[in-house]
Each structure stands twice: as C-alpha cells, then as structure tokens.
C-alpha cells in the first residue's frame, strides 16, 4: 500500500497487551509490529481478536488488517482512522457487540445535541445494541444498525457525529458472525453479555455458601 503520510505518530497503546503506554512510531509501521514487537503480544498468550484505533470513534480491525501500514489513508481505507492516537487491543475474551455498545454509549453522552442524526440517531443505535446484548435482538435489527449508521455518517454536522458509527459499522462488517450468534442463538461466545448467560449449580462443588 502506498504511504503518503510522513513523520512519526504517538499512540496510547492499551488493552489486552503485555506492554502498555505511550509509543512513538514512524508512519508506515504496521499494526503487527506495534502489537507484537513493541507491545509484546497478547497478555496470557491468548488469541488476538481486534484492535481499535483512533479513540472512541475509531473502527475495530481484525487479524487480516495486522499488516496494514499505519498512516492516515491506510487506516481510513481499512475502516478506522488515526484520530486521537488511541490503540486498544482486544483478545478472545472480548465481545465485539458489547465493545461497539461501550463506545457508542460514550458518544451519546458526548453529543452536543445540535444535529438530529447525532442526537437522535445514535440513541437509536444504542437502543438497538442494548436490545441485542440483552437477548431481544433480531436479524432485522442488524440491517437497521447498518442503514442508520451510514445515514448518521453522511448527515451529521461535525466530526464526532460523522465518525460515531464507526465502531458499530466496523464490527458489523468484521464480526458479523458474533452479531448473528447474539440474535439467532441468543449466545455470547465471549460470555460478556450477562443476559445471554445461564448459570447452573454443580452439586459436587457446592459448599452451601448461599452467594449464588
């Protein structure tokens, strides 16, 4: 991929990674180099799942994006952005539907409320994500998420509103199988969505503590 951005960029490296902190890397350094060489790989030897770049409005990228050179154009083409320089690494224990909901919840709180797409549209997106993580979602809701997300990107007035659907749209594109598990099977493979979990007592291990 052609690299047009020059110089260096500071990132705040965080999440499920061995070495966290502020790093400065030359433009063109790949995500793989940052995560595995500078970041020391995934904590506990667990499997890499996603990396979100650019702060709360950035997209979530997958293993297929790890060799993407870091610069403005390439991150944008991959469905994320440079943004504020945040870089959060996720592993197999993270639910991508819940991740999208987490970031959107922040955006809803930060919206100034001036334009309808951001003020109302993002609230509708959040309602749909809450519905899905609570086990009440349908496949039609996934289509609504995608359509509404694109409308918000195209019609919001400022950068916050225009980029706010990125976590939703990128996880829908890259982790659609997880969304389908939530709405079809009512399961969360990462076991993060509590409404989709069931609990049983193992009589052989129970000590009668009455805490569960």
Region roles according to the model:
Residues 1-198:
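Redox cofactor-anchoring modules in respiratory/redox and cofactor-processing assemblies
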Residues 198-204:
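Acidic, Ser/Thr/Pro/Gly-enriched interdomain connector segments
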Residues 206, 212:
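Short cysteine-rich clusters marking metal-coordination/redox-active sites
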């Amino acid at each position: 991929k052609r690299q047009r951005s020059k110089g260096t960029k500071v990132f705040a490296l965080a999440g499920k990674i061995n070495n966290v902190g502020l790093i400065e890397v030359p433009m063109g350094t790949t995500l793989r180099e940052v995560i595995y060489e500078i970041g020391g790989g995934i904590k506990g030897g667990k499997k890499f799942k996603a990396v979100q770049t650019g702060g709360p409005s950035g997209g979530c990228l997958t293993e297929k994006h790890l060799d993407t050179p870091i610069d403005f154009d390439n991150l944008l083409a991959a469905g994320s952005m440079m943004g504020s320089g945040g870089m959060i690494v996720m592993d197999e224990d993270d639910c991508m539907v819940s991740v999208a909901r987490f970031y959107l919840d922040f955006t809803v709180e930060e919206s100034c409320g001036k334009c309808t797409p951001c003020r109302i549209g993002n609230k509708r997106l959040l309602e749909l994500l809450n519905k899905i993580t609570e086990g009440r979602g349908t496949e039609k809701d996934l289509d609504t998420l995608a359509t509404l997300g694109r409308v918000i990107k195209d019609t919001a007035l400022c950068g916050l509103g225009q980029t706010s659907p990125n976590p939703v749209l990128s996880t829908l594109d890259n982790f659609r199988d997880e969304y389908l598990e939530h709405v079809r099977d009512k399961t969360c493979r990462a076991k993060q969505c509590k409404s989709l979990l069931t609990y049983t007592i193992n009589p052989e291990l129970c000590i009668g503590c009455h805490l569960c």
